Amino acid sequence: MKAVVLAVAVLFLTGSQARHFWQGDEPQTSWDRMKDFAALYVDAIQESGKDCAAQLDASALGKQLNLNLLANWNTLTSTFNNLREQLGSVTKEFWDNLGEDTVWLRQQMNKDLEEVKQKVQSYLDNFQKKVNEEVERYRDKVQPLGKELHKDAQQKLKELQEKLAPLGQDIRQRAREYVDALRTHLGSYTQGMRQGLAKRLEALKESAPVSEYQVKASKHLKTFSEKAKPALEDLRQGLMPVMESLKASFLSSIDQASKQLSAQ
């Protein structure tokens, strides 16, 4: 029975209740907002039905059949509004009684909601606390391992340097021996080249005037210089970016090596 009364109340809310929605003089309760929404919904249905009836009357079929749906709809709406006004006092009393009867229910629901919120907050706090404890425990376990790893790395590096030191010394010694042997082997060739060059210079002096060769040599050098100057300039321009790149790479390598040594 209460469900039937509730349905009737929703359908036959008074117009004054709908207007109260727009006035907003006093803060509305949830029940007032519900009643105003129901009234607006009913008014919207009436307007939509009126527009639909007008469109059907204006159509070719409506004119041919002389439906007059709009007039009938207006009559029905007027009758409906009269009935709603007559039931206005009944619906008002129903909403007031329903609001009073459910005050305790809303209070209990708010209380239960607050208890749930407190329980959930307590659980979240406890969960956060446990997570922090686990993170701290993990950090305590990892920190000695990190120190041990760093210590082992330094020890391994030191051992590697000690092992490589004799090898480097041996390589340097062998390189010196190779250089000395190469110098000794090339000594005889350089001596022979110097002697041959001295003989050719002596023969050159005897076969032609020195001044003539000097003039020819100067001329050839001048011609070579003029021809080689553009090529040398192009070579210099081409080498400049390469040298700058090598310089930047070298400085970057030195910087990285310095950072690694500082970190150790």
Curated annotation (Swiss-Prot):
Record-given protein name: Apolipoprotein A-I
Pfam families: Apolipoprotein
Residues making up the signal peptide according to the UniProt record: 1-18
Keywords assigned by UniProt, alphabetized: Cholesterol metabolism, Glycoprotein, HDL, Lipid metabolism, Lipid transport, Lipoprotein, Oxidation, Palmitate, Phosphoprotein, Repeat, Secreted, Signal, Steroid metabolism, Sterol metabolism, Transport
Lineage: Eukaryota, Metazoa, Chordata, Craniata, Vertebrata
Function as written in the Swiss-Prot or TrEMBL entry: Participates in the reverse transport of cholesterol from tissues to the liver for excretion by promoting cholesterol efflux from tissues and by acting as a cofactor for the lecithin cholesterol acyltransferase (LCAT). As part of the SPAP complex, activates spermatozoa motility.
Region (10 X approximate tandem repeats): 67-264
Annotated compartments: Secreted
GO-annotated cellular components: chylomicron; endocytic vesicle; extracellular vesicle; low-density lipoprotein particle; spherical high-density lipoprotein particle; very-low-density lipoprotein particle
The UniProt record lists the keyword Calcium: no
Domain of life: Eukaryota
Residues modified to Methionine sulfoxide: M109, M193, M240
Family named by the database record: Belongs to the apolipoprotein A1/A4/E family.
One GO MF term: protein homodimerization activity
Family annotation (PANTHER family): APOLIPOPROTEIN (PTHR18976), APOLIPOPROTEIN A-I (PTHR18976:SF11)
Record text on subunit structure and interactions: Homodimer. Interacts with APOA1BP and CLU. Component of a sperm activating protein complex (SPAP), consisting of APOA1, an immunoglobulin heavy chain, an immunoglobulin light chain and albumin. Interacts with NDRG1. Interacts with SCGB3A2. Interacts with NAXE and YJEFN3.
Post-translational modifications reported in the UniProt record: Glycosylated.
Entry keyword annotation includes Transit peptide: no
Biological process per Gene Ontology, one example term: negative regulation of interleukin-1 beta production
Sequence repeat locations: 67-88, 89-110, 111-121, 122-142, 144-165, 166-187, 188-208, 209-229, 230-240, 241-264
